[in-house]
C-alpha cells in the first residue's frame, strides 16, 4: 500500500489563472439532470434565478415533451388525454448489480394522466407506469444490458436562417441564396439568379417567383412595390410574375407542390398554412427562433415556433439588400462552419428526441383506442400503450450511432469519450459527403473545440473533443469564458461568450503581461479580432482577455508538456495515443507533467473521492470506512481486478492509512493508471538518443532487460469466456464434469459441477466449463423417455461441447460467475444456465509491443538487450531505452527533447544560486529555485518552463553520490558502450521521458494455424486471427515462388495445404500412418470457377492429353468415397487445432 503523500508539483507557470478548471463531466451530467428534472437541476435553476442569469433552462426535458403532446384529442374533439407531473421511483438494482447480472441500470417512470370527456366534463386521473428509463451513473455513463456505454454529443447545423453567396461561372455575377431551416418541417429557400429575379423554392420543389408567395400571403402589387420598389431585382420579378390575385397565387403554388391534383382555393390555403404556420407540422424550436430573431433583428416571442409573415418579408428584404450591396456591415452572408451556426445536441436532447418519437407513435394508438373503446369504460390506463415509448428508448441505447461502447482502456480514454463531439450520426453528416471545409479548423473553434485532438483517418475533423473550459448553453451553443477588460484594465468579472458574440469583441491572449493593478504592462497589446485576424492595438480598445493559455485545447492535449514546441500533426498523435495506454502493474506519475493530471484523474471517476470530511476508521484492500465529523459513517467499496470493456484491469487501492484525517473531495484510493490521485499513464524511463547497431532504425526501440525482470512495463489483461446451457430439440444441454472420451487429467482442475476452479493455470485448449449436448436424429418416444427416467441418463448419446481456452490465450482463472434459472436469475429464453469464467494474464513487455511518448513519438520494440550491454552513464547507471535521434528533426516534435532535459533535472533535484539573471529571478518568484531529487514538476501548455530556464537548471542540478554532475547545460552526457566499456566518441543526450505502453500488444496480433475451419464454397481456409484462419498466399507470393522455380512447394500451397479436399484427407491419413504423401488432386476453387463459367452458359470441359473429356465429380462424392476408402469419419467437422488432430 502506498504511503499517503500529497501529490504536489513544482509548477513553472507564470500566469495565475482566475478560473478553476470546471467539472469535466458537466457536458454529460448537467444535460441528463435537465432531461429528468432532478433535484440537482432544480438547485441550478434556483441559483440562476437568484443571480438573474439565464444559463439554465427552466423546464425539464421530459416535462417539455409531455407538455407538447398534451392534450391528445380524438378525431371529433369530444375526448382528450393529457400528461403532467412525471416522477421517478428509486432504481431497483445498483450500478454494480446491473453490471454483474447483465441488466440495465434504470428507474421506473410514472406520469399522471388525465382523461377528460369534453361532452360530460368528467375527468378521470391515474398514475401510469411509462416503462423503465435508463439512468446515468455518477460517472456520466449508462449501463445497458450489463455493459457501460457513453452517449456522444452531436454537432449539427442549428435551425435558423442562412444566407449564402455563390459566383456564377458564366457571367461572373454574385448569386445570393437563403435557406430557412426549421428543427422539423419544410424548408423555405430564396434565391436570386443571374437574370436578377428573386425566386423561392417551397419544400425543395420547383422554383417560383417570390412575388407569388407574397401575393399568396395576401399582399397586392401596390403593397409589394411600396415595400420593395427601391430594389430593381424585385421590380424585374414583379414584371415577370403572371399571377394577378391572391387566389391565382395560391393555385399556382398548389400546382407546383402537388402536380396532378385538382387545385382549389381552400386546399391551397390549407396546404400553405400547414407547411409553415401550423405548430404541429412546423417548428423552428427555441434555438431556431432565437437565431432568426438575431439575424433579422426581429422581436418575435421566443415560444413562437412557426414562421410569421414578418419573418418571410424580412428574409426577402435581407436577401435583396445583400444583392444590392447595401450597408455591408449589417447585411452579410453566413459561414456554415462557424460555431455560431453549429450547435450541440447533448445526451439529454438526444434521449428527449427519442422519447418524443415514441410518444408520437403512442399518440396514434391512443387516438384509435378512443374511437374503438366504450366511452364509459375508458380510463387513461386502457388508452395508453407504453410499448412504442419503451421500444424507441431501447432502440436508441442499443443501436444508435451515438450510443457507443465506452472506451475504458484507461481513465483518460473514458473521460475523453464522454467529452467527444461528433458531426456524424442521424441528422448529421456522413463520412463520404463531408468535404474539406467542414473538417478544417475554424477560428470560432478557439476555446470551444480542440484544434488538435481528432482521429487520423476517414473521421478526421468530424469527431472532436470539447475544450477544457468550454460549456454548453441552453440553446446548445458552445461558450468559452473570458475576463472582462474595462478601460484598459482587467476586472475580476468572467463572461461566457458564444462564437457569434465573441466576433463582436476584441480579445487579448492569456499571456499578455499585466501590472499588479490589472492594467496592461505594454502600450500595445496583441489581440484577436473577428475571423481570427491578429493585430497590435492600444490597451483601452481591448474588450476581453483569455482566462488561461490551455483554454483552446482539450484535456488530453493539455496533458502534453511542451505542447508549444511540437508540430500539430505529432501533437494529434500524442493526444490520441495517451488514450491507448494500458494500466501498468504499478502506476507512476510523470516527473514532467502539466498540472492537469490530478484534475483529470478525479473527474474521470476511476479514483475514490471522499464525500465528507472525517477520519479513516477502518480499511483493507476491499473497502475504506470513514467516520465523518458529524458522527455518520460511510464505507467506500473498492473495485478489485475487474475487467474493463477493453480487457484491461480495473483495480483500486487505498492511499490513506487508518487514523488519517481526510477532507471532502480528497482522493482516498487510486484506480487504474493513477498514482496518488494523479493521472499516471506510463513510466519515467532513462532514455538515450543514439543509433545502436542499426537496431533502432526507423522508429524501432531498444529496451533494457531490467524493464522485463522488474515488471516495470508489465500489465494485467483479463479475458471473459462465457458458455450457456440451452434447451435443444433433443433435450437440454448440461453443464457437467462427466464428458465422454476425455481423460481424467484434462478434468483435474474442474470442480464437481464441471467448472474450473479459481486459481487454476490454463493454456490453449484446456477445458474451462464441461458441457455436453444431446446428439441423435430422432425425437424420443414416451417409452424411451420412461426407460431413461428409470435407468438414468448414462445410456444416452451426447457430444462434448465444452468451453475451451481459445488459441493464443492462457493465464490464471480469477473469477467464475454462474447464473441459473433455478436460482431465480433472469436469463434469455431457452437458456437454463450461464457460466462466465474470467482469465487474467500478466503480460511482460516483449519485442513487437508498441511504446510511445506523449509527443507522437511512437515505435515498436525491436530488441531487448541484457542490462550489461546497454550504454551506461559515468556512475554506472545503465539507460532503459535507446531511441533513434533521426526520428526527431523532420517530425518537429521537439517537446520530447525538452521533456528529456527537464525530466533529468526533476529526477536529480536542483539548487539555483542567488544570481541576478532574469530566469533565476523568475524561478525565485514562483518558488521553483530549489527541489530535492525525484520532485515532480508541472510545465503547463503554452506557459511552461522556458529554454533558458532548462539550460540554467541543467547546470544547477544536485551532484550524485560521487559528487559529480553527469550532465551540464548541453543536456548531454558521456556514455559508455556496455559491451566494450569504451566511451562513445560523442556526448549523447540523456534524460527521463514518460513512456507509455499501448494496447497494440504483439500477443494479441501474433497467430499461427495448422488445421482449422474452411470456407463453405471455396473450401479454402478462412482468413484472420478471429476466424483462426490461414496465411493468405496471394498472387505476388505465387510469382515469387514461380521466379525461384519452387514448383513442388507451390503445388502443395495451392492444393493440399489449401482447397484440394480429397488431397487434404489423404495427406492427413498418410501423416498419421507415416506413409509417403500422395499426389495432389484438383483444387475446389478450380471446380467453383468452372461451375461459375457453366452458369454463364460457357461450356467449359476438362480434356485429357489425348483430347478425351474428363468428368469431374462433385466434391461431396469425392470426399465420401475417399473417406470410405480411408476409413476416416467425416461426420465431424474439420479439426480446428493441433490438440484435436
From Swiss-Prot:
Disulfide bonds: none
GO biological process: DNA-templated transcription
Origin superkingdom: Bacteria
GO CC terms of this entry: DNA-directed RNA polymerase complex
Enzyme Commission number(s) from the entry: 2.7.7.6
UniProt keyword terms in alphabetical order: DNA-directed RNA polymerase, Nucleotidyltransferase, Transcription, Transferase
Recorded family membership: Belongs to the RNA polymerase beta chain family.
Subunit structure: The RNAP catalytic core consists of 2 alpha, 1 beta, 1 beta' and 1 omega subunit. When a sigma factor is associated with the core the holoenzyme is formed, which can initiate transcription.
Protein name: DNA-directed RNA polymerase subunit beta
Species of origin: Parafrankia sp. (strain EAN1pec)
Amino acid at each position: 500500500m502506498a504511503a499517503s503523500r500529497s501529490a504536489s508539483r513544482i509548477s513553472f507557470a507564470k500566469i495565475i489563472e482566475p478560473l478553476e478548471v470546471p467539472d469535466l463531466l458537466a457536458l454529460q451530467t448537467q444535460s441528463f439532470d435537465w432531461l429528468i428534472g432532478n433535484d440537482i437541476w432544480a438547485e441550478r435553476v434556483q441559483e440562476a434565478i437568484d443571480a438573474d442569469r439565464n444559463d439554465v433552462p427552466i423546464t425539464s426535458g421530459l416535462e417539455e415533451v409531455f407538455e407538447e403532446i398534451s392534450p391528445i384529442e380524438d378525431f371529433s374533439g369530444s375526448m382528450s388525454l393529457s400528461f403532467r407531473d412525471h416522477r421517478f421511483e428509486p432504481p431497483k438494482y445498483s450500478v454494480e448489480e446491473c453490471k454483474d447480472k447483465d441488466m440495465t441500470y434504470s428507474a421506473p417512470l410514472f406520469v399522471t394522466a388525465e382523461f377528460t370527456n369534453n361532452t360530460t366534463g368528467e375527468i378521470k386521473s391515474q398514475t401510469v407506469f411509462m416503462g423503465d428509463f435508463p439512468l446515468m451513473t455518477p460517472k456520466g455513463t449508462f449501463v445497458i444490458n450489463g455493459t457501460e456505454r457513453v452517449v456522444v454529443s452531436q454537432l449539427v447545423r442549428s435551425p435558423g436562417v442562412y444566407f449564402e453567396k455563390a459566383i456564377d461561372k458564366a457571367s461572373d455575377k454574385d448569386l445570393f441564396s437563403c435557406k430557412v431551416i426549421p428543427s422539423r418541417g419544410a424548408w423555405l429557400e430564396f434565391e436570386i439568379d443571374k437574370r436578377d429575379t428573386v425566386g423561392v423554392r417551397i419544400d425543395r420543389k420547383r422554383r417560383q417567383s417570390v412575388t407569388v408567395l407574397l401575393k399568396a400571403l395576401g399582399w397586392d402589387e401596390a403593397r409589394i412595390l411600396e415595400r420593395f420598389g427601391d430594389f430593381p431585382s424585385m421590380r424585374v420579378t414583379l414584371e415577370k410574375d403572371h399571377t394577378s390575385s391572391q387566389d391565382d397565387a395560391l393555385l399556382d403554388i398548389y400546382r407546383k407542390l402537388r402536380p396532378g391534383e385538382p387545385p382549389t382555393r381552400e386546399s391551397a390555403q390549407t396546404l400553405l398554412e400547414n407547411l409553415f404556420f401550423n405548430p404541429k407540422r412546423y417548428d423552428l424550436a427555441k434555438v431556431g427562433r432565437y437565431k432568426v430573431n438575431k439575424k433579422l433583428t426581429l422581436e418575435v416571442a421566443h415560444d413562437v415556433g412557426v414562421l410569421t409573415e414578418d419573418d418571410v418579408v424580412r428574409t426577402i428584404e435581407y436577401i435583396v439588400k445583400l444583392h444590392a450591396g447595401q450597408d455591408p456591415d449589417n447585411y452579410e452572408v453566413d459561414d456554415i462552419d462557424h460555431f455560431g451556426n453549429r450547435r450541440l445536441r447533448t445526451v439529454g436532447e438526444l434521449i428527449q428526441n427519442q422519447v418524443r418519437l415514441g410518444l408520437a407513435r403512442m399518440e396514434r394508438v391512443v387516438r384509435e383506442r378512443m374511437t374503438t373503446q366504450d366511452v364509459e369504460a375508458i380510463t387513461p390506463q386502457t388508452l395508453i400503450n407504453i410499448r412504442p415509448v419503451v421500444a424507441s428508448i431501447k432502440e436508441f441505447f442499443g443501436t444508435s450511432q451515438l450510443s457507443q461502447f465506452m472506451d475504458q482502456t484507461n481513465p483518460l480514454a473514458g473521460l475523453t469519450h464522454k467529452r467527444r463531439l461528433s458531426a456524424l450520426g442521424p441528422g448529421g453528416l456522413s463520412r463520404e459527403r463531408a468535404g474539406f471545409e467542414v473538417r478544417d479548423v475554424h477560428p470560432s473553434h478557439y476555446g470551444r473545440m480542440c484544434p488538435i485532438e481528432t482521429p487520423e483517418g476517414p473521421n478526421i475533423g468530424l469527431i472532436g473533443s470539447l475544450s477544457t473550459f468550454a460549456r454548453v448553453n441552453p440553446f446548445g451553443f458552445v461558450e468559452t469564458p473570458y475576463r472582462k477588460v474595462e478601460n484598459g484594465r482587467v476586472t475580476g468579472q468572467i463572461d461566457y461568450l458564444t462564437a457569434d458574440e465573441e466576433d463582436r469583441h476584441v480579445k487579448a491572449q492569456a499571456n499578455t503581461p499585466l501590472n499588479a493593478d490589472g492594467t496592461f504592462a505594454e502600450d500595445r497589446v496583441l489581440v484577436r479580432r473577428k475571423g481570427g485576424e491578429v493585430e497590435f492595438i492600444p490597451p483601452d480598445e481591448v474588450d476581453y482577455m483569455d482566462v488561461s493559455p490551455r483554454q483552446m485545447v482539450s484535456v488530453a492535449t493539455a496533458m502534453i508538456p511542451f505542447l508549444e514546441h511540437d508540430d500539430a500533426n505529432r501533437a494529434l498523435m500524442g493526444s490520441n495515443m495517451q488514450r491507448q495506454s494500458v494500466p501498468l502493474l504499478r502506476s507512476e506519475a510523470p516527473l514532467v507533467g502539466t498540472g492537469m493530471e490530478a484534475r483529470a484523474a478525479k473527474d474521470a471517476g476511476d479514483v475514490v473521492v471522499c464525500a465528507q470530511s472525517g477520519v479513516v476508521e477502518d480499511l483493507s484492500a476491499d473497502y475504506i470506512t470513514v467516520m465523518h465529523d458529524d458522527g455518520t459513517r460511510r464505507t467506500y467499496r473498492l473495485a478489485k481486478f475487474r475487467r474493463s470493456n477493453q480487457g484491461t484491469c480495473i483495480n483500486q487501492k487505498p492511499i490513506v492509512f487508518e487514523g488519517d484525517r481526510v477532507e471532502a473531495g480528497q482522493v482516498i484510493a487510486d484506480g487504474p493508471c493513477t498514482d496518488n490521485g494523479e493521472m499516471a499513464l506510463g513510466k519515467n524511463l532513462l532514455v538515450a538518443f543514439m543509433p545502436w547497431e542499426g537496431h533502432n532504425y526507423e522508429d524501432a526501440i531498444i529496451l533494457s532487460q531490467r524493464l522485463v525482470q522488474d515488471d516495470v512495463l508489465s500489465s494485467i489483461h483479463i479475458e471473459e469466456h462465457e458458455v450457456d446451457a440451452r434447451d435443444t430439440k433433443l433435450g437440454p444441454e448440461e453443464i457437467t464434469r462427466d464428458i465422454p472420451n476425455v481423460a481424467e487429467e484434462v478434468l483435474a482442475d474442474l470442480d464437481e459441477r464441471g467448472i474450473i476452479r479459481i486459481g487454476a493455470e490454463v493454456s490453449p485448449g484446456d477445458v474451462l466449463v464441461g458441457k455436453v449436448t444431446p446428439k441423435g436424429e430422432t425425437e424420443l418416444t414416451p417409452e424411451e423417455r420412461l426407460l431413461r427416467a428409470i435407468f438414468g441418463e448414462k445410456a444416452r448419446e451426447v457430444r462434448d461441447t465444452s468451453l475451451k481456452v481459445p488459441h493464443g490465450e492462457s493465464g490464471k482463472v480469477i473469477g467464475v460467475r454462474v447464473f441459473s434459472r433455478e436460482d431465480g436469475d433472469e436469463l434469455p429464453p431457452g437458456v437454463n444456465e450461464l457460466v462466465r469464467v474470467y482469465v487474467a494474464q500478466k503480460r511482460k513487455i516483449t519485442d513487437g509491443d508498441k511504446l510511445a511518448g506523449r509527443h507522437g513519438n511512437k515505435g515498436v520494440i525491436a530488441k531487448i538487450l541484457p542490462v550489461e550491454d546497454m550504454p551506461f552513464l559515468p556512475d554506472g547507471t545503465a539507460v532503459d531505452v535507446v531511441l533513434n535521434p533521426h526520428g526527431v528533426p523532420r517530425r518537429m516534435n521537439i517537446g520530447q527533447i525538452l521533456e528529456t532535459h527537464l525530466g533529468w533535472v526533476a529526477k536529480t533535484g536542483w539548487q539555483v544560486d542567488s544570481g541576478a539573471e532574469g530566469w533565476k529571478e523568475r524561478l525565485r518568484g514562483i518558488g521553483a529555485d530549489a527541489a530535492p531529487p525525484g520532485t515532480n514538476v508541472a510545465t503547463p501548455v503554452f506557459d511552461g518552463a522556458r529554454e533558458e530556464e532548462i539550460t540554467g537548471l541543467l547546470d544547477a542540478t544536485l551532484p550524485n553520490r560521487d559528487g559529480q554532475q553527469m550532465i551540464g547545460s548541453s543536456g548531454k552526457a558521456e556514455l559508455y558502450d556496455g559491451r566494450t566499456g569504451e566511451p562513445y566518441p560523442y556526448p549523447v543526450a540523456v534524460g527521463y521521458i514518460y513512456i507509455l505502453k499501448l494496447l497494440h500488444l504483439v500477443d494479441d496480433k501474433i497467430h499461427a494455424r495448422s488445421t482449422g475451419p474452411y470456407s463453405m464454397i471455396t473450401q479454402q481456409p478462412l482468413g484472420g486471427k478471429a476466424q483462426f484462419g490461414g496465411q493468405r498466399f496471394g498472387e505476388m507470393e505465387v510469382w515469387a515462388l514461380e521466379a525461384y522455380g519452387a514448383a513442388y512447394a507451390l503445388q502443395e500451397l495451392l492444393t493440399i495445404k489449401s482447397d484440394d479436399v480429397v488431397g487434404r484427407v489423404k495427406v492427413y491419413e498418410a501423416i498419421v500412418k507415416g506413409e509417403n504423401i500422395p499426389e495432389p488432386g484438383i483444387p475446389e476453387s478450380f471446380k467453383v470457377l468452372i461451375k461459375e463459367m457453366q452458369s454463364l452458359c460457357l461450356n467449359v470441359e476438362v480434356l485429357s492429353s489425348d483430347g478425351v473429356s474428363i468428368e469431374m465429380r462433385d466434391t461431396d462424392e469425392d470426399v465420401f468415397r475417399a473417406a470410405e476408402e480411408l476409413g476416416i469419419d467425416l461426420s465431424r467437422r474439420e479439426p480446428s487445432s493441433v490438440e484435436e488432430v
